[in-house]
Amino acid sequence: MISHRNAIANIMQIVTYESTYQSDEPELCLGVLPQSHIYSLVVVSQASIWRGDGVVVLQGFELEQTLLAIQTNGIKRLWLVPPMLVAITKAPRIVESYDLSSVSVAAVGASGISKDVMATFGELLPACKIIQGYGMTETTGVVCFGNVEDSMDGSCGHLYPGYEARLIDGEGKDVESHNTPGELVLRSPSVVIGYYNDESATSEAMMDGGWLRTGDLVEIRQSEKGHEHVFVVDRVKELIKVRGLQVAPAELESHLILHPAVAEVAVIPVPDDRAGELPKAYIVRASGAELDEQVLRKELSQYVEGQFARHKHLDGGIEFLDSLPKTASGKMQRKTLKEKARTDAEARRQAREKAANGVHKVHVNGVKRPEKMEVFDLSSDDEDDD
């Protein structure tokens, strides 16, 4: 449940934070994100309008249509999600055919982006600075965002004014040192009231004293200027536990997306009797990737194995899909993929069981042998012997 106070608080937090480095002059920004999502609703539709900025609204993200809108209108600020940024970096020839010199800032939220993707984007738009942010519906939008005056690769920036933050370990104790991961817990006037008609979920997320458990594993690191930055490692619940060792899906995804044959990727855990869980990758092939699936599967496995420790290898498999399930804001729906993995595994188990049950035992001269199997029909000579 989001109150008017929550929404107003986050708008004021955004505008106050941006006033430390942004000109008072209104600017034109890109409105390609779905406004039904909290990120676009608060940042684009509310905070930008409150500042007096103009918003060029598009019905959805289509690469060339978006680039044309930027060129035609002289858009200065891009509000994006990572899949859009990746799409731009994967089409350098198309991007270079448009005049994007007006763009000075690309603000990216919803999930992380790799250093290599940022570098490629920087080569295509050298005058544009990328800043990353972090937020969630439960905070009515944004918690922190990068600052062009003090940036760090991979950082989600600094906490917005009005936020209090703590990191806690698995036992609920405070993490008090830099560069040490812990679950982020927050307190702010923008933190929501709770979940509608769901006291159980509300009590699970809300701690005593008005603190919200985000479920995100975070580190606090200091920049060379001495400012503290928020680094999101991964979702606590999405960490894959392989033989007691933790694997962050985002780490594998940020590496796999750099392969030229990969357009999109999501890594999830699949159960394993020996290891507990194993990483599995769902991949959308890039257009023009013509390798046979088996060949590409082997190549991608080796691509990971050459970079990561043994427990991070894709021993759960690689599966190719036409598309990956995402929310309207572009965030990957891992729950849907996990359910698909469970359903597929159950279907394979039932198929094996059905095949086994299709083998009937009969006695022939005191010796048991198969009479019929689902896959193979026994010869008529064998049937005559019966």
From Swiss-Prot:
The keyword Ligase belongs to this UniProt entry's keyword annotation: yes
Annotated spans, SBD2: 133-195
Family: Belongs to the ATP-dependent AMP-binding enzyme family.
Organism: Purpureocillium lilacinum
PANTHER family in alphabetical order: BCDNA.GH02901 (PTHR24096:SF422), LONG-CHAIN-FATTY-ACID--COA LIGASE (PTHR24096)
The keyword Ligase belongs to this UniProt entry's keyword annotation: yes
UniProt-annotated binding residues for substrate: 137
Domain remarks in the Swiss-Prot or TrEMBL record: Both substrate-binding domains (SBD1 and SBD2) are involved in the substrate recognition, and are sufficient to confer the substrate specificity.
GO MF term list: ATP binding; CoA-ligase activity
Gene3D superfamilies on file: 3.30.300.30, N-terminal domain of ligase-like
Region feature Disordered, mapped onto this chain: 352-386
Gene behind this protein: lcsD
Pathway info: Secondary metabolite biosynthesis
Highest taxon of the lineage: Eukaryota
EC number(s) on file: 6.2.1.-
Protein's recorded name: Acyl-CoA ligase lcsD
Location of the region described as SBD1 in the Swiss-Prot/TrEMBL record: 62-132
Keyword annotations from UniProtKB, A to Z: ATP-binding, Ligase, Nucleotide-binding
